Amino acid sequence: MGSAQNERIPSLTRWYIDTRQLTVTNPSLPLLEALQPSDQEAVKRFYHLRDRHMSLASNLLKYLFIHRSCCIPWNKISISRTPDPHRRPCFIPSPALTEATDEPIPGIEFNVSHQASLVALAGTIIPQSHGASPNPTTVFANPSPSSVPAPSVPQVGIDITCVDERHARTSSAPSTRDQLAGYVDIFAEVFSSRELDTIKNLGGRFPADAQDGEAVEYGLRLFYTYWALKEAYIKMTGEALLAPWLRELEFTDVIAPEPAPAPGQGSAENWGEPYTGVKIWLYGKRVEDVRIEVVAFETGYIFATAARGAGLGAESRPLSRDAGVAVSVDRWMHMEKIDIDRDIAPCATGVCQCTKKQP
């Protein structure tokens, strides 16, 4: 696995861990002892093994990103949180760590999500050319839905939804258009009237009287796509689902990503084709500076990523492949699968070369 970033060119790292097989085969908590005691206790507070594994994977991803991005020893890492009420995980180097480090420790921005045994992280290094790195507690003290604290400050959000999880846990998943409409209406405080109508109407993809399973299934995928988009955006700002402007944030031109093809049928490690055509509106005005995309993983998962600031927003979209036009390098890295034994264990146990100075 390559380094997290090229520090001179901000890029968006995106990693994920799939804990499903771990939960089936391993009742233990690998590398738990490599976390700080408070993080170990947080993992063990979960009752179900799969929830423990997701919490563990979330911590391991955060530690790995901090370790690789900031080039500090694993055992010196500690996770901080932004002020109440949001309590967003962040990294604030302690004065002792800063004094003991020869090189300046770069500021970083990251966000994590977990759902149905999958855990994902999106993160970036704050460019050092912009002077002193801002303190995350300051950046997210007063979250703004419409703008970054400063153009040089990146903000990222990521979210995972699972279309199949409701089917697996209950027998009450909607099976008709009327049931779908009733289910969607439960979330009237989250979605705008236009978004609710679009979901109920299946985005105009099916006839108004279509009642078959395919139509309802698409409606559920569309609902979870909207949910992932909204979560990714508000997490990018540092807010939560309690944000008072939730219904004023609207997404249009939304298409539920098709389930990813089976392995060997053109898919890249079970990933579908990212959809980037979503338009964002806030208080009725078009949001132009945010880049957002959704992509399907396997048949049941939908990932959404949002970013703005420091060249990672809308301006970071790669150029088209029109004849005679060079294709720019995409600053958004593809989703990369992280293996606990292969990728994390060497760093967590101190045998990696991440903190060694290059000759």
UniProtKB/Swiss-Prot annotation:
Mutant lacking the gene: phenotype: Leads to the loss of the green conidial pigment and decreased viability of conidia. Impairs virulence in both insect and murine infection models.
Alphabetical list of InterPro entries matching this protein: 4-PPantetheinyl_Trfase_dom (IPR008278), 4-PPantetheinyl_Trfase_dom_sf (IPR037143), AASDHPPT_N (IPR055066), P-Pant_transferase_sf (IPR050559)
EC number of the protein: 2.7.8.7
Catalytic reactions on record: apo-[ACP] + CoA = holo-[ACP] + adenosine 3',5'-bisphosphate + H(+)
Ways its activity is controlled: Activity is inhibited bythe antifunfal copmpounds PD 404,182, 6-nitroso-1,2-benzopyrone, and calmidazolium chloride with IC(50) values of 3.9 uM, 35.2 uM, and 19.2 uM, respectively.
Record-given protein name: 4'-phosphopantetheinyl transferase A
GO annotation, cellular component aspect: cytosol
Biotechnology annotation for this entry: PptA is a druggable target in Aspergillus species that can be targeted in a selective way. Its combined role in both primary and secondary metabolism, encompassing multiple virulence determinants, makes it a very promising antifungal drug target candidate.
Taxonomic lineage: Eukaryota, Fungi, Dikarya, Ascomycota, Pezizomycotina
GO biological process terms, semicolon-separated: 1,8-dihydroxynaphthalene-melanin biosynthetic process; fumagillin biosynthetic process; fumigaclavine C biosynthetic process; fumiquinazoline C biosynthetic process; gliotoxin biosynthetic process; lysine biosynthetic process; lysine biosynthetic process via aminoadipic acid; N',N'',N'''-triacetylfusarinine C biosynthetic process
A molecular function GO annotation: holo-[acyl-carrier-protein] synthase activity
Keywords attached to this entry: Transferase, Virulence
Functional summary from the UniProt entry: Acyl-carrier-protein synthase that transfers the 4'-phosphopantetheine moiety from coenzyme A to a Ser of an acyl-carrier-protein. The 4'-phosphopantetheine (4'-PPT) portion of CoA provides the essential prosthetic group for a number of carrier proteins and multi-domain enzymes, priming them for the acceptance of acyl building blocks in fatty acid synthesis and many aspects of secondary metabolism mediated by polyketide synthases (PKSs) and non-ribosomal peptide synthetases (NRPSs).
Family: Belongs to the P-Pant transferase superfamily.
Native organism: Aspergillus fumigatus (strain ATCC MYA-4609 / CBS 101355 / FGSC A1100 / Af293) (Neosartorya fumigata)
